[in-house]
């Protein structure tokens, strides 16, 4: 490799990430009579596993203004809260394309009609926190029956799930996706919540809370 003395500057716009957008898609799905339009999202097929899972659960998406950009396909995505949310027996073949999104998918499955089953997902326990164990404990905390092993979880959905108690989510390992999943649960299911370590959301989504507030989410930040 031959080095160069000077590098040329350039401008490059990075398309929006579907993984981050999925938290707001979940908020839409879990809120009655809601709709959402996400702009200029990267819809590379390797990143669309969660969307494909949600389609199987009865969520309908519209893709508009598709175009190629720097070798990627970007598109606007429109989604509405479904009248009926179905459970899913998720094929293992879909796991690798949705591994980072399973936490929020589990929350959605908690309000689906029927029993959802996810298997061969032991990798979740080797993320920023043991996410499969954390998810199972979280679902039990909010009254959702589930049965988990080291690499699977069965979730008994409740379409009428609503919360009215007091809930505390410690998130002791400061997992950004655990914090964002908990926040979406608090905003859509009700109850009074205290969720620790909001700053960890900056790991992958620095503007998460700002956007939550922009679309009407109400919360207060407290210093430790």
Predicted region positions:
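Short, structured segments at the rim of ligand-binding sites
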Residues: 1-224
């Amino acid at each position: 490799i031959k080095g160069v003395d000077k590098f040329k500057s350039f401008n490059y716009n990075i398309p929006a990430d579907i993984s981050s957008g999925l938290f707001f898609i979940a908020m839409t799905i879990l809120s009655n009579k809601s709709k959402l339009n996400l702009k200029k999202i990267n819809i590379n097929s390797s990143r669309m596993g969660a969307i494909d899972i949600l389609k199987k659960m009865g969520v309908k998406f519209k893709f508009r203004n598709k175009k190629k950009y720097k070798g990627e396909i970007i598109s606007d995505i429109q989604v509405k809260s479904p009248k009926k949310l179905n459970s899913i027996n998720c094929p293992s073949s879909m796991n690798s394309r949705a591994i980072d999104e399973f936490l929020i998918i589990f929350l959605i499955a908690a309000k689906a009609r029927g029993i959802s089953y996810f298997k061969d997902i032991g990798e979740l326990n080797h993320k920023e926190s043991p996410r499969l164990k954390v998810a199972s404990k979280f679902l039990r905390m909010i009254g959702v029956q589930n049965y988990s092993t080291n690499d699977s979880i069965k979730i008994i959905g409740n379409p009428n799930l609503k919360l009215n108690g007091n809930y505390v989510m410690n998130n002791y390992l400061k997992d950004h996706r655990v914090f964002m999943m908990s926040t979406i649960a608090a905003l859509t299911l009700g109850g009074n919540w205290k969720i620790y370590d909001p700053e960890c959301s900056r790991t992958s989504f620095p503007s998460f809370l700002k956007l939550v507030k922009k679309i009407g989410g109400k919360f207060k930040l407290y210093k430790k």
